[in-house]
């Protein structure tokens, strides 16, 4: 029954061919040992799959490592080719494009800077003219104000004199009107 070598008789076989001795129900210690050994072999054949699974695992790991190693080599080779292509073709093109674009951009930037500088100068000149005009206007207004204040007492005196004359005329007129009214009230 065992798969690896000599077979040992099982308890039933030992009882049949063992002479004529009567055995008890459990049998002898040697027979029990044989039964346990046979049960262990049956158990290992039916239920213990460790040797098979270990072999499969070793095979899977070996295949995986071989395929992975080849895949990594291919990936590294592709990366190397891409880097070489980039260094040989793409990088010079990018440099040329960048140089051309930068020169044009710098020229435009310089032109914009010059025009802004001119605009700032014009604005400063315009502000200076406006400030000069405002300063001159302010000085002129101050002179006019001072002249006005100097002429004010004379004008006030003239107005006061004119007012006094008008008051005198009104008094005389009212006095004359009272006389005329007194003439008419005697009737």
Swiss-Prot record:
GO BP: any one term: anterograde synaptic vesicle transport
- Residues of the region (Disordered) are 1-27
Q: Which InterPro entries has this protein been placed in?
A: Bloc1s5
Instruction: Name the source's superkingdom.
Output: Eukaryota
Q: Which residues carry this modification: N-acetylserine?
A: 2
Instruction: Give UniProt keywords alphabetically.
Output: Acetylation
Tell whether Iron is among the UniProt keywords: no
Q: Please verify whether the record's keywords include Acetylation.
A: yes
Give a Gene Ontology cellular component term annotated to this protein.
axon cytoplasm
Q: Say which family it is in.
A: Belongs to the BLOC1S5 family.
- Extract the PANTHER family matched here: BIOGENESIS OF LYSOSOME-RELATED ORGANELLES COMPLEX 1 SUBUNIT 5
The subunit structure is: Octamer composed of one copy each BLOC1S1, BLOC1S2, BLOC1S3, BLOC1S4, BLOC1S5, BLOC1S6, DTNBP1/BLOC1S7 and SNAPIN/BLOC1S8. The BLOC-1 complex associates with the AP-3 protein complex and membrane protein cargos. Interacts with BLOC1S4, BLOC1S6, DTNBP1/BLOC1S7 and PI4K2A. Component of the biogenesis of lysosome-related organelles complex 1 (BLOC-1) composed of BLOC1S1, BLOC1S2, BLOC1S3, BLOC1S4, BLOC1S5, BLOC1S6, DTNBP1/BLOC1S7 and SNAPIN/BLOC1S8.
Q: So what does this one do?
A: Component of the BLOC-1 complex, a complex that is required for normal biogenesis of lysosome-related organelles (LRO), such as platelet dense granules and melanosomes. In concert with the AP-3 complex, the BLOC-1 complex is required to target membrane protein cargos into vesicles assembled at cell bodies for delivery into neurites and nerve terminals. The BLOC-1 complex, in association with SNARE proteins, is also proposed to be involved in neurite extension. Plays a role in intracellular vesicle trafficking.
Instruction: Identify this protein by name.
Output: Biogenesis of lysosome-related organelles complex 1 subunit 5
Q: Which gene encodes it?
A: Bloc1s5
């Amino acid at each position: 029954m065992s798969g690896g070598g000599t077979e040992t008789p099982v308890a039933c076989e030992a009882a049949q061919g063992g002479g004529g001795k009567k055995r008890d129900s459990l049998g002898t210690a040697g027979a029990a040992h044989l039964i346990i050994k046979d049960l262990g072999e049956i158990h290992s054949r039916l239920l213990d799959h460790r040797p098979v699974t270990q072999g499969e695992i070793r095979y899977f790991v070996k295949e995986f490592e071989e395929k992975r190693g080849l895949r990594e080599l291919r990936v590294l080779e592709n990366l190397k080719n891409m880097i070489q292509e980039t260094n040989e073709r793409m990088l010079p093109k990018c440099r040329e494009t960048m140089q051309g674009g930068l020169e044009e951009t710098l020229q435009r930037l310089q032109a914009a800077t010059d025009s802004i500088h001119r605009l700032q100068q014009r604005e400063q000149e315009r502000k200076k003219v406006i400030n000069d005009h405002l300063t001159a206007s302010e000085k002129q207004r101050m002179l006019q104000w001072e002249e006005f204040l100097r002429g004010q007492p004379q004008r006030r005196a003239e107005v006061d004199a004119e007012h006094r004359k008008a008051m005198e005329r009104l008094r005389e007129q009212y006095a004359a009107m009272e006389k005329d009214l007194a003439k008419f009230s005697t009737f």
